């Protein structure tokens, strides 16, 4: 495929949740809760879900669990939402195997994070992303998050990778709006905001949508924000963006996994606790999160 004529909203979605992975009390994968959560998120306004990403605690799940989770979510909502599978690790060969496994399960696309910890050079990033993109026919989103991976995907590297027929976009958590806007204009790559605090600015730069964490508890608000922006009602988009700001503050304090699982529980949706080394919210953190969610009008 090519970015020329690639319909990212239809093929990948516009308001996607980087979905948490539900675990049972014994720490095992809770597939029933995963199906319920997927349906809840789509019912709330998401047209796409990302499974086994950062917020999905992918470093703590086995390949078999990743496949099972993907299968369950596809069965639950795959006929009415795009399901994107996280397939990135710091091992290229492992990432290729994961990509092929996700394609075999029927994923609609792949999210491939920058190899973390090992700090490869840009030449290594090009080779890594190319190998994963070559492994299947699925559309691939690069995931640029130097706050976790240390190494950024430099603009020149993204431009080079944009020529690959399967690489169609970027999830940006680097916050370089200027560079991202230039790349969107030059390459036609679909950009997705990977930082909820910058959702509205990214739309202004030409982004397709969001791969969001706060959408676990505010999917409808983000859908309304996007709709307002695309219809030209910038004042309403700004108002909605300001309303959900307390959720971004909560995520910054607690981290995406802990905030999302605690927030869902406050809304009556139990997805279990995180796996170590992530930990559940403390009573004090839950009290503060409750106040933030009420301020954002997502909790009574």
UniProtKB/Swiss-Prot annotation:
It catalyses: L-aspartate 4-semialdehyde + pyruvate = (2S,4S)-4-hydroxy-2,3,4,5-tetrahydrodipicolinate + H2O + H(+). PROSITE patterns: DHDPS_1, DHDPS_2. The record marks 54, 117 as: Part of a proton relay during catalysis. It holds the Pfam family DHDPS. GO terms for cellular component: cytosol. Pyruvate binds at residues 55, 211. GO terms for molecular function: 4-hydroxy-tetrahydrodipicolinate synthase activity. CDD domains: DHDPS. PANTHER family: 4-HYDROXY-2-OXOGLUTARATE ALDOLASE, MITOCHONDRIAL, DIHYDRODIPICOLINATE SYNTHASE. NCBIfam families: dapA. Catalyzes the condensation of (S)-aspartate-beta-semialdehyde [(S)-ASA] and pyruvate to 4-hydroxy-tetrahydrodipicolinate (HTPA). Homotetramer; dimer of dimers. This is 4-hydroxy-tetrahydrodipicolinate synthase. It comes from Mycolicibacterium paratuberculosis (strain ATCC BAA-968 / K-10). The gene is dapA.
């Amino acid at each position: 495929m090519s970015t020329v004529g690639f319909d990212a909203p239809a093929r990948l979605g516009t308001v996607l949740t980087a979905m948490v992975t539900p675990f049972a009390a014994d720490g095992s994968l809770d597939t029933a809760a995963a199906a319920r959560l997927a349906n809840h998120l789509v019912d709330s306004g998401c047209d796409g879900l990302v499974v086994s990403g950062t917020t999905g605690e992918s470093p703590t799940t086995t390949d078999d669990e990743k496949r099972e989770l993907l299968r369950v979510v596809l069965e639950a909502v795959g006929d009415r939402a795009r399901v994107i599978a996280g397939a990135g690790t710091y091992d290229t060969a492992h990432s290729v195997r994961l990509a092929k496994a996700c394609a075999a399960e029927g994923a609609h696309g792949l999210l491939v994070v920058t190899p973390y910890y090992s700090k490869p050079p840009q030449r290594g990033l090009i080779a890594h992303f190319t190998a994963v993109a070559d492994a299947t026919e699925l559309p691939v989103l690069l995931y640029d998050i130097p706050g976790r991976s240390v190494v950024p995907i430099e603009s020149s590297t993204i431009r080079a990778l944009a020529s690959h027929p399967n690489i169609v976009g970027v999830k940006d958590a680097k916050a370089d709006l200027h560079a991202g806007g230039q790349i969107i204009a030059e390459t036609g790559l679909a950009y997705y905001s990977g930082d909820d605090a910058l959702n509205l600015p990214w739309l202004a730069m030409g982004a397709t949508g969001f791969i969001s964490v706060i959408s676990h508890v505010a999917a409808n608000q983000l859908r309304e924000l996007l709709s307002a922006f695309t219809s030209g009602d910038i004042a309403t988009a700004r108002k909605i963006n300001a309303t959900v700001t307390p959720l971004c503050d909560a995520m910054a304090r607690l981290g995406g996994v802990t905030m999302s699982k605690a927030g869902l529980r406050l809304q009556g949706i139990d997805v279990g606790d995180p796996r170590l080394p992530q930990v559940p919210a403390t009573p004090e953190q839950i009290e503060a999160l409750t106040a933030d969610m009420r301020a954002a009008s997502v909790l009574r």
